[in-house]
Amino acid sequence: TKALNDCRENVERVVAQGAPYTWENLCQPLAEVDDVLGRIFSPVSHLNSVKNSPELREAYEQTLPLLSEYSTWVGQHEGLYKAYRDLRDGDHYATLNTAQKKAVDNALRDFELSGIGLPKEKQQRYGEIATRLSELGNQYSNNVLDATMGWTKLVTDEAELAGMPESALAAAKAQAEAKELEGYLLTLDIPSYLPVMTYCDNQALREEMYRAYSTRASDQGPNAGKWDNSKVMEEILALRHELAQLLGFENYAFK
């Protein structure tokens, strides 16, 4: 929360200085403080994906509404929007290089896509949808992750793994030993899944793993209905359509 508060204070400070706005007194300070925020959150997000645990998942999920709220606040900040417009319409804009001009143009586009021109009640609804979509996206990812970790296959006959590289066999054997099992433990994690699909001569095993991988978090496959993302996807589609309609688009693909 301290990093988010610092970002908010920086936005207010930059806007309060008034025109004329330049790259140095508007864009650069905002980019620097956003970079600090990214350096804090990105490792947490990455660890949540590759080293997931109940404790880390809980901490990660607590940050999502805060980040969504901040993003909406920035995107609907009237003073900041006017500052960027003043920069684009002012003499300083002509002195910017191509990349800087593109950054300013993209920022103004993002304001429009965040509902800056909407009435207050519709802006509020935009924020509610954005927060819920963030939650649903995380729920979707969690279901896929849990479904990935929820499938394993123990192979006791090495002949069934003919064609596999020695490195992949050693990794599968280590996976089994870690769980005090005899043989080769296969999972749907890419380092385990990909060597089987690429090198294994056993067509039946490849098909079994392919079906398990392709039907994760769905109402199909070996874990059908468990960690099912069907309802999550339906709500995401409905909210995305509502969001697009709020912003005046025919559908979300045009957003």
Where are each of the predicted segments found?
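Zn2+-dependent metallopeptidase catalytic domains
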Residues: 1-255
